[in-house]
């Protein structure tokens, strides 16, 4: 099965007809605000509103730090289905890979698949995201780092099996991390979380996949993220 393309998302047709959209970001600490300043989901919201106007839709952040797929299933009805989304951007797995959580790769796959099917039952499209290639050398315990690699591959496989869109941050960021660790670490707050520039980069990359850009006066505020994006593009050339 081939993964869904971003151009196929129903929100594009809705926006062209001037219909109101609702987009929900669902996940853990990398979805919830982890530090002050603009967050990757803010850049997504700004990009849509720059193109389609400030009243084009609601952009709801439903991330909770420390969550696993078990937690997302538990709070699904109240904190996702409640919003009746047209699109869900789901980023999960960084806590499932913690050995203390006792979530096996098989359970992670099953839970993620169930989440996708529940979201589809709402009539919503899905963008699955992998994490941003965490700093595996600095993750403790080492077993968590190994599990992280496994779980991110599962995200890719579920995206294909469930025909969702995929934003594969992990694969993109890994090229920089594995080639230039010093530059990669300029985008990280710690081994598991991005800093301001990392947030900019994720948001700008997502906007590009949606076929959108920020207004020129907004782009002037995003020079670090744009430079990081250009650097990563060179590793994909």
PLM ranges: what are they?
Residues 62-67, 91-102:
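Cell-envelope and extracellular/periplasmic
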């Amino acid at each position: 099965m081939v993964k869904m393309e971003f151009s196929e998302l129903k929100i594009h047709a809705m926006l062209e007809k001037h219909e109101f959209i609702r987009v929900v970001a669902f996940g853990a600490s990398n979805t919830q605000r982890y530090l002050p300043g603009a967050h990757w989901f803010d850049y997504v919201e700004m990009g849509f509103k720059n193109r389609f106007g400030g009243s084009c839709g609601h952009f709801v952040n439903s991330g909770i730090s420390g969550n696993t797929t078990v937690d997302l299933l538990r709070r699904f009805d109240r904190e996702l289905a409640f919003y009746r989304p047209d699109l869900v951007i789901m980023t999960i797995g960084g806590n499932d890979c913690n050995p203390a959580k006792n979530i096996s790769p098989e359970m992670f796959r099953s839970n993620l698949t169930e989440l996708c099917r529940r979201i589809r039952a709402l009539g919503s499209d899905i963008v699955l995201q992998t994490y941003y290639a965490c700093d595996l050398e600095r993750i403790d315990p080492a077993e968590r780092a190994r599990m992280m690699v496994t779980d991110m591959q599962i995200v890719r496989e579920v995206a294909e099996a469930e025909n969702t869109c995929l934003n594969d941050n992990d694969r993109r960021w890994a090229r920089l991390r594995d080639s230039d660790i010093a530059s990669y670490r300029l985008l990280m707050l710690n081994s598991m979380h991005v800093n301001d520039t990392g947030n900019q980069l994720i948001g700008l990359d997502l906007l590009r996949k949606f076929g959108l850009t920020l207004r020129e006066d907004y782009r002037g505020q995003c020079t670090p993220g744009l430079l990081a994006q250009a650097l990563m593009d060179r590793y994909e050339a």
